[in-house]
A protein has these predicted regions:
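Juxtamembrane intracellular "pre-TM" segments in multi-pass secondary transporters
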Residues: 2-16, 197-234, 257, 323-330
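Cytoplasmic membrane-interface "Motif A"-like loop-to-helix N-cap segments
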Residues: 78-92, 285-305, 400-402
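Substrate-agnostic recognition of the 12-TM MFS/MFS-like secondary transporter fold
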Residues: 16-33, 57-95, 110-169, 184-185, ...
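Symmetry-related core transmembrane helices of the 12-TM Major Facilitator Superfamily/SLC fold
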Residues: 175-193, 404-418
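Transmembrane alpha-helix termini and helix-breaking/packing motifs in multi-pass membrane transporters
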Residues: 35-46, 100-105, 158-181, 256-257, ...
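Soluble catalytic domains of membrane acyltransferases
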Residues: 442-575
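Helix-loop junctions on the cytosolic side of multi-pass membrane transporters
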Residues: 129-131, 135-136, 181-208, 314-317, ...
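C-terminal ends and interior cores of transmembrane alpha-helices
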Residues: 90-106, 301-331
Length: 575
C-alpha cells in the first residue's frame, strides 16, 4: 500500500501551526541577520572595519546556542510546550519591535544587541521545536514531520536572505525592513496560538540557572544516551559542519571560480537550499512511514560523491572573461554540471539529516528529550565554529583553493561515516535491509506487537541464509544485536560489518556480551540452524526474560511474512 504524501500533515491542526510558527521564525532570523549584514556593508557608516562587524554579527548570533541551549532544554521538560512556544514568540515580537526602531534610527550597537537576543530566542526555541514533534505526531509520521520541518527551515533561510536583499536595495530600506520583521514576528505569534497542548514531561524539574554547569550536565546527558542516539548527535552536528562550510564559501566560490555576480550567488544558494528541501521531502516517501535510519548511509555516500564531483568540475571549469549573472551561468555547460553537483549535495544532505533527527527524537526518553535536543544544538554550534576555523586554516594557512577545500571536507565526510557506522552497525544493517526490500524481498510482520517496545528480550531465529539477517533487522523498530552459533561463510562475514557476532559454544548465557546486553535491557537475536535446541539450553537460565521465536515464511516471489510467536518466558522468581 502506498504511503500517503507527507504534505498531508500540513492539513492537520496538530502539525500545521507548529510548522508555520517555526518557518516564520527561521525566515525572520535570516531576514534580520542578512539585512543587518547588508546595512553594515552598504548603509551604516562606522569607524570599525566592515568585515570585522560582519564576523562579529555571525558570532553574536551563534554564541547564544552555546550559552542558552541547555536552559532551553530545561524549559522544554519543565513547562507545557505550546504555552512555552507562545511565550517565546511573544518575546520575539518584543525583540523585533526594538529591532525595528534600531533599524529606523540606524543604531548599530542596538542592532547588534537585537541580533544577540534573536539568537537567544532561537536557542531557547530549538529544543522545544524538535522535542514537541513526537508529542503531536505518531512514530509513523516522524520522518514526514521532520522532513517538512527541514524543508521549511532551509526554504525560510533562503527566503529570508533573498527578501533582505530586495528590501535593502530600496532607498526606503529602513521602514521596509522594520515593518517586515515586526509583521513576521506577529504572524508567528498568531500561528503559535493554534499549537495543541503538549504536556510537560518533567514538571517537577528544578531549573539550574548556572550556564556552564548545566551545559556540561546536558552534554553528559546527551552522550549518556543509547549509543545510536549519541552517535546520531555527532552525525547530525557533522551535517551542520558541512552546511556551514558550503554556505559560507559559496559567495567567494561564485565570484572567484565561476566569475559570477550577486545574482549568480543567489542562484547557487537557491539550488543548494532547494536540494536540501527536496531530499528532506523525499525521505518520507522512501521510509514507508517509519524511522528509517537505513537512508543515512545512502545520504552520506551521496554527499561525498557530489562533493568530489564538485571539486572535479570546478577544477576543470574555464570561467568566462565577462562577469556572469544567473542566466549567463545557466548558459555555461560546465556551470550546469557544477549546479547539478550542488543540488546533489543538498538532496543527499536532506536524505542524511532527516532520519538522524527522527532517531534522536524517537529513541530519547520523553522526560529527557528536550535536553537531549539541547545537547545536540550545543554540539551543532560547536561544529559550525570548527568549520569556520578549519576553512581559515586550509584556505589562509595551507593555501588550498575553495574547490580543494570542498574535496577535503568530502573525504572527511567518508571518515566520519566510517566512524559512525562502525560505532552503530545498525545503520548499515538497516541500509542493506532497505535496499533488499526495494529490489528483491519485501517483509510484512505478523505478531510484531509481541516484541516489547522497551526492555530485554531474546529472539530465536532459524538461520539458513545471510539475507535473513537483513530482512529481520530491517523489520524491527528498535535496535537488534545479532549473534550466531554457526560458522560464518564468506558472504556472511560481510555481516560482521553490520554488527553480527559469532558465539563460541551453545550456551549463550556464558557469553559476557550477551549477558551484558540483557542486563542493559537490549533486544538480542540468536541465529541458529537449530533454534529449538538453543531454547532448551536457555530455558533454565533466562530468568524473567521474554523469549520469542521468529520465522520467515514465503508469501510470494518477492514477499515474506515475519511471523513472531512466544517461545516462552521464565518467571523472575524461578530458581
Amino acid at each position: 500500500m502506498r504511503s500517503p504524501s507527507s504534505l498531508a500533515l500540513l492539513g492537520k491542526k496538530r502539525f500545521l501551526p507548529l510548522f508555520v510558527t517555526q518557518l516564520l521564525g527561521a525566515f525572520n532570523d535570516n531576514l534580520f541577520k542578512q539585512a543587518l549584514v547588508l546595512a553594515i556593508l552598504y548603509r551604516i557608516g562606522s569607524t570599525v572595519d566592515a568585515n570585522v562587524l560582519v564576523n562579529l554579527s555571525a558570532l553574536l548570533f551563534i554564541l547564544p546556542f552555546f550559552l542558552f541551549s541547555a536552559l532551553g532544554g530545561q524549559f522544554g521538560e519543565r513547562f507545557e510546550k505550546s504555552r512555552l512556544i507562545r511565550a517565546l514568540k511573544l518575546w520575539e515580537v518584543a525583540i523585533m519591535t526594538v529591532g525595528a526602531l534600531a533599524m529606523w534610527f540606524a543604531h548599530l550597537p542596538l542592532l547588534l544587541l537585537v541580533l544577540f537576543c534573536m539568537g537567544t530566542q532561537s536557542a531557547l526555541f530549538g529544543p522545544v521545536k524538535y522535542s514537541i514533534l513526537p508529542q503531536v505526531l505518531d512514530e509513523r509520521e516522524l520522518m514526514a514531520g521532520n522532513g517538512l520541518v527541514e524543508m521549511g527551515t532551509f526554504l525560510a533561510i533562503l527566503g529570508g536572505t533573498l527578501v533582505a536583499g530586495l528590501l535593502m536595495s530600496s532607498e526606503r530600506y529602513a521602514i521596509l525592513v522594520a515593518a517586515s520583521v515586526l509583521a513576521v514576528a506577529l504572524a508567528g505569534y498568531l500561528a503559535s496560538r493554534q499549537i495543541p497542548l503538549a504536556r510537560a514531561p518533567l514538571p517537577e524539574l528544578a531549573l539550574d540557572w548556572h550556564i556552564l554547569r548545566q551545559t556540561r550536565q546536558i552534554l553528559r546527558l546527551g552522550f549518556g544516551q543509547h549509543r545510536s542516539v549519541s552517535r546520531a548527535m555527532i552525525g547530525n552536528s557533522w551535517f551542520w559542519f558541512l552546511g556551514a562550510t558550503y554556505l559560507t564559501q559559496i559567495p567567494a566560490f561564485a565570484k572567484g571560480v565561476l566569475n559570477g555576480n550577486e545574482t549568480a550567488v543567489t542562484l547557487i544558494l537557491s539550488v543548494f537550499s532547494i536540494g536540501i528541501a527536496s531530499g528532506s521531502m523525499l525521505c518520507a516517501r522512501l521510509s514507508a512511514r517509519k524511522v528509517e535510519i537505513g537512508l543515512v548511509p545512502l545520504g552520506a555516500l551521496g554527499v561525498s560523491l557530489c562533493g568530489v564531483l564538485l571539486w572535479w568540475h570546478a577544477s576543470t571549469f574555464s570561467a568566462a572573461p565577462q562577469v556572469l549573472g544567473a542566466w549567463g551561468l545557466l548558459a555555461e555547460p560546465g556551470a550546469r554540471w557544477i549546479l547539478l553537483d550542488i543540488f546533489g549535495l543538498g538532496l543527499f544532505g536532506g536524505i542524511y539529516i532527516v532520519p538522524l533527527y527522527a532517531l534522536i527524537q524517537s529513541r530519547s526518553p520523553e522526560h529527557q528529550r528536550a535536553r537531549v535536543v539541547a545537547a545536540n544544538n550545543i554540539l551543532n554550534a560547536l561544529f559550525m565554529v570548527c568549520s569556520a576555523i578549519l576553512a581559515i586554516l586550509l584556505l589562509a594557512v595551507v593555501g588550498l583553493s575553495i574547490a580543494q577545500l570542498f574535496l577535503v571536507v568530502s573525504l572527511f565526510n567518508l571518515l566520519l561515516a566510517f566512524y559512525l557506522f562502525r560505532a552503530v552497525p545498525e545503520f548499515l544493517l538497516r541500509c542493506g535491509a532497505w535496499l533488499l526490500g526495494r529490489t528483491r524481498q519485501r517483509v510484512r510482520g505478523e505478531g510484531g506487537e509481541r516484541i516489547p517496545a522497551h526492555g530485554a528480550a531474546l529472539l530465536l531465529a532459524r538461520h539458513e541464509r545471510w539475507v535473513e539477517v537483513l530482512l529481520i533487522g530491517g523489520a524491527m523498530r528498535r535496535p537488534v544485536h545479532f549473534f550466531t552459533t554457526d560458522v560464518l561463510s564468506p558472504p556472511s562475514r560481510l555481516l560482521r560489518i553490520c554488527g553480527v557476532s559469532a558465539l563460541d559454544g551453545e550456551d549463550v548465557q556464558l557469553s559476557g556480551r550477551v549477558a551484558g546486553l540483557m542486563a542493559a535491557g537490549e533486544l538480542v537475536c540468536l541465529l541458529s540452524r537449530e533454534p529449538a535446541r538453543a531454547w532448551q539450553v536457555l530455558q533454565g537460565r533466562a530468568h524473567g526474560l521474554a523469549v520469542l521465536e521468529i520465522e520467515l515464511r514465503e508469501d510470494g516471489p518477492r514477499s515474506r511474512i515475519l511471523h513472531v510467536t512466544l517461545a516462552g518466558a521464565v518467571d523472575r522468581e524461578s530458581p
